[in-house]
Amino acid sequence: KGGHGGKKKFCVSTQHYSFAVNAFVDLIKQYGQDEYDFSLRETQTYEIIEDVARMRSEIGILFLNDFNEVVMDKILKSHDLEFHLLFIAKPHVFISRNHPLAGREIITNEELEQYPYLSYEQGEHNSFYFSEEIFSPFERKKNIRVRDRATLFNLLIGLNGYTVCSGVI
């Protein structure tokens, strides 16, 4: 978007992904001039859809899988939006380097069962279909939901928790 006096404006709404932040940094380095007004909104899934539909953001970054694809496609179409695939992700378990399971090549769901599972809460639209995590439909004994990435990582370290995500950092 062109801003007042030639200042470039641009906004991206995204789920909580480091790769999106890194891409945003690259974007600013490539297109940032003397003046710009760029925004990166790490937010809940439904808010991302609303942001793009209402033109608050030019781009939204969402995770789709076999479980949520049909529902999310309907929601996107109802907002007159399109989904474009960036990449296909394989699940990775994120744990701290001091976690008892650290250093293992493969970790099973049974081995993770005793540890807290950390995920992002989705507010009033808190449904499995809006989840940011790859294996969200699985039932877990210990669940902690947070709103921001820093809190998730601090709890992951402090409680020997884990999350499952794309592995793209």
Q: Residues of each region from the PLM?
A:
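Hydrophobic hinge/microswitch elements
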Residues: 53-56, 122-169
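Beta->alpha turn/N-cap motifs
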Residues: 44-45, 61-68, 96-97, 148, ...
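Secondary-structure junction motif
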Residues: 20-23, 69, 109-138
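Central regulatory/effector-binding core of bacterial HTH transcription factors
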Residues: 7-71
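Flexible hinge/capping segments at coil-to-helix
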Residues: 4, 75-117
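Alpha-helical "hinge/linker" immediately C-terminal to small N-terminal DNA-binding modules
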Residues: 1-7
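General small-molecule cofactor/ligand-binding pocket signal
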Residues: 37-41, 84, 143-145
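Short hydrophobic/charged patches on amphipathic alpha-helices used for structural packing
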Residues: 49-53, 83, 109, 152-153
